[in-house]
C-alpha cells in the first residue's frame, strides 16, 4: 500500500481501493499533480468544509463515481450536488469494503463558502483509518486536544499532523500531539502552502525525534510504503 503526500493536507492512499483525503488539487500552489493525473478514486474523505480541504471533492466524486465520507452536514451539502456520500459523526466508526474509518475530534471551523454565503459545515474532524492491516491517522485541521492521548491505544502506524500554526497547531504543539499519540511515524502537513502558515519543518523533525517519535518529511509527491 502506497501513501502519497500531495501538499497542504492532501493524502492519497493507493491499495486495493484508492482513497484521497482533503482533495485540494486545483488552486493548491504546492500540489505536484493535476486532477487528470490522479488515479481512479474510490473514496474521498473530507475532514471539514473549508475550501482548502473540501477542494475538488465534487469533481473527483462525479468523475470516478466515488463516495465521499464526511460529517452529516457536508454530506447533505454534497448530496444536493449529485454526489454519492456516506455521512458519519465524531466518535462514530464504520467498516467499509477497504477497512474501518473512525471520525476523531478536531478543534477548528468547518464553514463552506458558497458564493457570497457561508454555509454551516458541521463539526471538523480527523480520521483514523484501519486499512490492509495498518492504521493511518489524519488529524485534519486542529489545535492540540487532550483527546489525542486516546490515540496512543490505537498503535497508529503513521500520523499526519498539521504544524503550520495560525489556523492549526504550531511546531511546539504538534510535537506535544505526536508525543501523546505515539505513532510509529509522524508526517508533518499543512505548512508552507502560503506564507501565513510557514513552519520550520526541520525544527519539528528535530524536536519530535528528541521525544522518540520518528519523523518522515514528505515533499509533495513523495510516498511512504506501508
Swiss-Prot record:
GO MF:
hydrolase activity
Do you know which Pfam families this protein is assigned to?
A: Lactamase_B_2
Q: Which SUPFAM superfamilies match?
A: Metallo-hydrolase/oxidoreductase (SSF56281)
Keywords of this entry: Hydrolase
Q: Which family does it belong to?
A: Belongs to the UPF0173 family.
Which protein is depicted?
Answer: UPF0173 metal-dependent hydrolase TM_1162
Source organism? Thermotoga maritima (strain ATCC 43589 / DSM 3109 / JCM 10099 / NBRC 100826 / MSB8)
